[in-house]
């Protein structure tokens, strides 16, 4: 377990700031409308998954939350706190799995990819249904049918985005790292 993933070291603070900015940019320019109101196909969640896997739950939460707040303010002039927290907790839950994987040491096996995708699908369902939908019903008096439709589509789209693009990004990242024990002194 990499205990540095829990700390707000200068490296993690930089990752938090840069990651939040990238979240806003990708969220702004790589968002495809789904046809369901206020629900888009968001490529940014593959980036969030990658950041959470590299830097852990603290940075994952921060990038998801801060990035989503800034994106909402930029796009709509207001924010929906329950959905912002949902994005943050998505990064947090994926980051928790990162504590069990040595991706910085070039390890991301097929088994780890499968577990990663199970984790992210479950995390997507939890955050979008519980925090997003239930939050909208409680805080904004939104109709259940509407918010559960949004949560279902969001879970499906974000889960697929992370499964395909997120897994590819993580495999490429792991492949760029020097594997532990691969360098030998001659």
Swiss-Prot record:
Primary location group: membrane
The keyword Transmembrane helix belongs to this UniProt entry's keyword annotation: yes
UniProt-listed InterPro entries: ECF_substrate-spec-like (IPR009825), UPF0397 (IPR022914)
CC annotations in GO: plasma membrane
TM stretches of this protein: 13-33, 46-66, 79-99, 114-134, 150-170
Compartmental location: Cell membrane
Membrane topology: Multi-pass membrane protein
Domain of life the protein comes from: Bacteria
Keyword Transmembrane belongs to the record: yes
Alphabetically ordered keywords of this record: Cell membrane, Membrane, Transmembrane, Transmembrane helix
HAMAP family: UPF0397
Family affiliation: Belongs to the UPF0397 family.
Protein name as it appears in the record: UPF0397 protein Ldb1710
């Amino acid at each position: 377990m990499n205990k540095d993933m829990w700390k707000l070291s200068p490296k993690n603070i930089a990752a938090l700031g840069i990651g939040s900015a990238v979240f806003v940019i990708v969220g702004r320019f790589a968002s495809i409308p789904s046809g369901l109101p206020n629900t888009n196909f968001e490529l940014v969640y593959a980036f969030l998954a990658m950041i959470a896997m590299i830097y852990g739950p603290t940075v994952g939460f921060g990038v998801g939350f801060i990035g989503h707040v800034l994106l909402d303010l930029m796009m709509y002039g207001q924010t929906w706190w329950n959905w912002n927290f949902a994005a943050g907790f998505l990064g947090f839950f994926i980051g928790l799995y990162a504590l069990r994987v040595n991706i910085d040491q070039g390890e991301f096996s097929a088994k780890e990819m499968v577990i990663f995708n199970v984790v992210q699908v479950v995390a997507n369902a939890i955050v979008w249904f519980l925090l997003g939908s239930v939050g909208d019903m409680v805080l904004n008096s939104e109709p259940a049918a509407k918010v559960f439709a949004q949560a279902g589509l969001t879970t499906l789209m974000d889960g697929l985005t992370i499964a395909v693009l997120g897994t590819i990004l993580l495999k490429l990242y792991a492949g760029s790292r020097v594997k532990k024990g691969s360098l030998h002194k001659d």
